[in-house]
């Protein structure tokens, strides 16, 4: 049997953590869009300023979401059997955020590669980043 499937409880934890992270990210994205929409609806705001508000707000929201996934990656790396990241000699928080950024944006330079159940979170993060 493939070693990836020997620890079903760890795989379940990764799926659960992924679902929770995606749910939180979607909620944050939704609430920020609602807030932005209300702010832009105010009369008297020049159109150019509305565009700037939109760009800066959405940039901030996406960066926040990258950090949220980075936290999930870092926490899952602490769980024995959840996988590891090739290219990350000593797992640390900033490398987890970097992995999250290249995954969320689907850049995928190839210098960090998730292995094991952690791939589920990474694949789902890429999908979330694409539709966000």
Language-model segments: what does each one mean?
Residues 1-12:
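Short, strongly hydrophobic alpha-helical membrane anchors
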Residues 20-25, 91-132:
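Pore domain of cation channels
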Residues 26-48:
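Membrane-interface helix-loop junction between the first two transmembrane segments
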Residues 33, 69-72, 99-102:
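Alpha-helical transmembrane segments and their lipid-water interface positions
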Residues 50-65:
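Interfacial helix-start motif at the membrane-water boundary
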Residues 64-96:
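Outer-pore turret/helix-boundary of cation channels
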